[in-house]
A protein has these predicted regions:
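Vicinal oxygen chelate
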Residues: 57-58, 70, 120
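Short amphipathic alpha-helices in soluble, non-transmembrane regions
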Residues: 58-65
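Catalytic cores of NTP-dependent nucleotidyl/adenyl transfer enzymes across multiple folds
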Residues: 100-145
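Helical scaffold of the NTase/Pol beta-like nucleotidyltransferase catalytic core
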Residues: 1-28, 139-143
Length: 145
């Protein structure tokens, strides 16, 4: 396992512990969810989804990392910000609406004893583009379970 992937795992487990210890609902999303299921690759950033009403709380929680200003995409009902831990970009996303709508297909993954919440691999497959390089690896993993 290369150093970058080791660093990404360390950060994901560290963040999972922080959120679990502080009762903050979350899930790793997009390709980060695929990574959390054990399909390792060099990610561009780490994507995490939180309840919409927790944006200020979560941002304040990571003040020491100097998070960006809160941005928004109105037509998507999305707020977001990012920060860096050990040169890894952490992208925090907050969608309008009840969090339950966004956590329906969250699954618990255990990595080295640490609970991590991530979108299911089947959820990722439903929304993946045809040429997504992760799709064959996901099918292979699902077929071995």
């Amino acid at each position: 396992m290369n150093i970058k992937i080791q660093n990404q795992w360390k950060i994901i487990k560290q963040l999972g512990k922080i959120f679990e210890d502080n009762g903050i609902p979350y899930h790793f999303d997009g390709s980060t969810a695929v990574f959390a299921h054990g399909i390792e690759f060099d990610m561009d950033d780490i994507d995490i989804v939180f309840p919409f009403d927790r944006v200020n709380e979560v941002r304040e929680f990571f003040n020491e990392y100097k998070p960006s200003e809160i941005g928004s995409i109105q037509n998507l009902g999305l707020k977001y910000f990012h920060f860096y831990i050990n040169d890894e970009k952490i992208h925090c996303l907050f969608y309008e609406g009840p969090y339950e709508n966004f956590s329906i297909e969250d699954v618990e993954v255990i990595k080295d004893g640490q609970k991590i919440w991530a979108k299911s691999l089947n959820f990722y497959l439903r929304y993946a583009k045809e040429d997504d390089v992760l799709v064959p690896r996901i099918h292979k993993l699902l077929n071995t379970k």
